[in-house]
């Protein structure tokens, strides 16, 4: 029987390159070029000839502008942690399947199909000061005044959670379901408690998937825009960095300054991803 020739590592593979080429071109056209063009615009201030860092100096010298970074982090980080923990809890509990699993999963992922605008409108209708929840509580005599759950920090967190929980839940459910169940059974046969199995066996195996889910949810949370406008205070406590960029671009018509803010936003996301990747490497099982 003739042996099948194997390809040495590092040897050029034309077929593989042809398969990668469409994706590479897409990334270059849709991500790399816009970023480089935005970087170019940010270095060409409207009122200064030639290249300059004036836009970045203006941004970091104005507390009203650079404060949007911390506001955005204060929304993205807590939401990401809550989404990840709840998704992990449910996905870990559903990894073996149970009665009506498909029905429960469908209900949990339903918000994905609604879209950001429709979901925000639904939150306003249910959690708003004149929404169903407050009207029901007042009618039952449980409260005398409505809870203020929208047009503030809480409203934006509610929207972010409902948008991103289904995505994170599906990702973790698929990842956890792919872990060999015999590893868990073997640990239990050796006398390990359920908590020990989770902490010593399952958690190290889930760590790479948790890191990826955390990174993706964080990036989406950091880019919050419609929810911060519709359910928050876009000129106050929920004025995120994306809102600052929008205001400069479409209210002040200063595309150069808006590009600088967008670049700062991208660099913040990139720095966070680097930290997450480094932590993922440390947590990965050896």
List the predicted regions and their residue ranges.
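Membrane-water interface segments at the C-terminal ends of transmembrane alpha-helices
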Residues: 12-46, 63-146, 151, 156-176, ...
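Glycine/proline-centered hinge or cleavage motifs at structural transition points of membrane proteins
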Residues: 190-191, 204
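Short, Lys/Arg-rich, polar N-terminal cytosolic tail immediately upstream
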Residues: 1-11
């Amino acid at each position: 029987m003739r042996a099948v020739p194997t390809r040495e590592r590092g040897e050029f593979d034309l077929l593989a390159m042809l398969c990668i080429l469409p994706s590479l071109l897409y990334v270059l056209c849709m991500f790399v070029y816009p970023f480089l063009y935005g970087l170019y615009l940010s270095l060409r201030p409207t009122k200064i000839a030639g290249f300059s860092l004036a836009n970045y100096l203006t941004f970091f010298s104005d507390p009203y502008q650079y404060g949007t970074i911390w506001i955005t982090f204060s929304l993205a980080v807590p939401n990401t942690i809550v989404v990840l923990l709840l998704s992990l809890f449910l996905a870990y509990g559903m990894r073996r399947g149970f009665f009506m699993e498909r029905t429960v999963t469908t209900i949990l992922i339903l918000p994905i199909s609604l879209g950001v605008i429709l979901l925000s409108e639904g939150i306003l209708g249910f959690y708003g000061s004149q929404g169903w929840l407050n009207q029901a509580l007042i009618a039952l005599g449980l409260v005398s005044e409505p809870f203020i759950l929208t047009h503030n920090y809480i409203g934006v967190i509610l929207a972010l959670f409902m948008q991103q929980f289904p995505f994170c839940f599906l990702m973790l459910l698929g990842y956890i379901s792919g872990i060999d169940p015999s590893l868990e059974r073997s640990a239990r046969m050796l006398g390990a408690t359920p908590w020990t199995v989770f902490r010593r066996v399952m958690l190290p195996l889930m760590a790479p998937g948790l890191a990826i889910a955390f990174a993706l949810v964080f990036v989406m949370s950091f880019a919050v825009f419609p929810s911060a406008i519709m359910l928050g205070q876009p000129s106050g406590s929920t004025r995120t960095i994306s809102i600052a960029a929008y205001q400069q671009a479409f209210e002040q018509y200063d595309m150069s300054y808006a590009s600088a803010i967008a670049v700062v936003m991208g660099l913040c996301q990139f720095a966070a991803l680097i930290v997450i990747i480094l932590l993922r490497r440390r947590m990965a099982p050896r």
